[in-house]
Amino acid sequence: MPTIQQLVRKGRHSKKAKVATAGLKGSPQRRGVCTRVYTTTPKKPNSALRKVARVRLTSGIEVSAYIPGEGHNLQEHSMVLVRGGRVKDLPGVRYKIIRGALDTQGVKDRKQARSRYGAKKGQ
C-alpha cells in the first residue's frame, strides 16, 4: 500500500478498457482493401468452410473479416466496407464485411432479412 507522499508524487492510474474492434479506431465502419480471400474451418463442434477475407483498413491495420451470406464476388484488391462484430466459431475474426456496399454485391435471391445482406426488394 502506497504512502500518502507516494500518492501525492505519482497518483493512481486507472486501467483503460480494452476495445473489441481496435482496427476501426472508434468509427462505426471503415473502408479497406482485400489482401487475401480464403475459407477456413470453425471451432470444434461445428463443421463448415467459412468465407473470410484479410483486409487492410484505411487506419493502416490489417484484420480478418467474415463474409456473410451465400456466395460472394470478392477477390484480391476489392474495396470493402467493414463493421465490427465477431464470429463466435472463428478465432481471431472480429469484423464483418457489409454486403451491398462498395465492391461487395448483395446476396442474390435473398427474401428475408434483406437489409443485412444488401439485397434489393424485387431481385
UniProtKB/Swiss-Prot annotation:
Q: Where is the signal peptide?
A: none
Listed A to Z, the keywords are:
Methylation, Ribonucleoprotein, Ribosomal protein, RNA-binding, rRNA-binding, tRNA-binding
Q: Which GO terms describe its molecular function?
A: rRNA binding; structural constituent of ribosome; tRNA binding
Note whether Coiled coil occurs among the keywords: no
InterPro entries named in the record: NA-bd_OB-fold, Ribosomal_uS12, Ribosomal_uS12_bac
3-methylthioaspartic acid is found on 89
Matching entries from Pfam families are given as: Ribosom_S12_S23
Q: Among the record's GO biological process terms, what is one?
A: translation
UniProt xrefs under PROSITE patterns: RIBOSOMAL_S12
Annotated region (Disordered) at 1-31
Q: Does the keyword tRNA-binding apply?
A: yes
Composition-biased stretches (Basic residues): 9-18
Q: A cellular component term (GO) from this record?
A: small ribosomal subunit
Assembly and interaction partners: Part of the 30S ribosomal subunit. Contacts proteins S8 and S17. May interact with IF1 in the 30S initiation complex.
Which family is it part of? Belongs to the universal ribosomal protein uS12 family.
What job does the chain carry out?
With S4 and S5 plays an important role in translational accuracy.
Name of this protein = Small ribosomal subunit protein uS12
Q: What is the taxonomic lineage of the source species?
A: Bacteria, Bacillati, Actinomycetota, Actinomycetes, Mycobacteriales
Query: What's the encoding gene here?
Result: rpsL
